[in-house]
Amino acid sequence: MIQNKKVTICACASRSFVNKDKVAEIAAILRNEEYAVTVIPDLCEKVMQASPEITEIASSLIIACYPRAIRSHLHRLNLVAENILDIRNSGSDEILGQLQIKPCSDKENIPGKESIRKEIDAFPVESGTDAWYPVIDKDRCTECGRCRDFCLFGVYTSENRQIKVAQPQNCKNNCPACARMCPSKAIIFPKYEKSPVNGGLDEEEHFAPEEMDAMYRERLKMRLAQRKAGVSLLKNQ
């Protein structure tokens, strides 16, 4: 499955849905199997900042959340990730099994696990201020522009009839409203708790078309009032 034996694991340090002990276990076992493993605190942040190492990350095996979310993340930077495993919903034995690696029966005494866990625990926890922004699944997006019309924070723009996430840092933390409005369910917030908004394929959250239309009309009224009042909701303004 993976040729260069390079692995990137996202610990999602500021959120609780990725089990940190599971991250340490998998990282330790892979290192003991001579994989070059890097554990990062927040893949979302690295993509948002277009970090210099993101190209190398994309070429590695990425162990993070839903594959659809990760692919859409990297597409924003014109990168393609070929190998992605879901640590958010898969157990450590399942992930190791996909790499043809035998799990360890004594999970508490895996060589190197304790030091990796300390490394993870030292990552900064940015509750309420961690990277939170939408990514677009271009396989689903119809470029209708509803998200751009709906958003009050200037996150989206349209260039050559293509919707883009232009100002991810402007997004309001923990607000997935635009994703709920998307008729094709193309907008993903990887850190949201329910599918399909978080990139999952299940329908854990559903809104009827009439509810979506009502929310859309109400938001357009708010945008109009905002413009008339000359009020900006953008951060740092």
What are these model-predicted stretches?
Residues M1-A131:
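Iron-sulfur-associated redox domains of electron-transfer enzymes in respiratory
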Residues M1-K5, P168-Q237:
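Flanking helices and flexible, charged tails adjoining ferredoxin-like Fe-S electron-transfer domains
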Residues L30, S51, H75, V80-A81, ...:
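Alpha-helix boundary/interfacial micro-motifs
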Residues V39-P41, D137, E211:
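Helix N-cap / beta->alpha transition motif
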Residues S92-I95, C144, R217:
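Short alpha-helical interface patches
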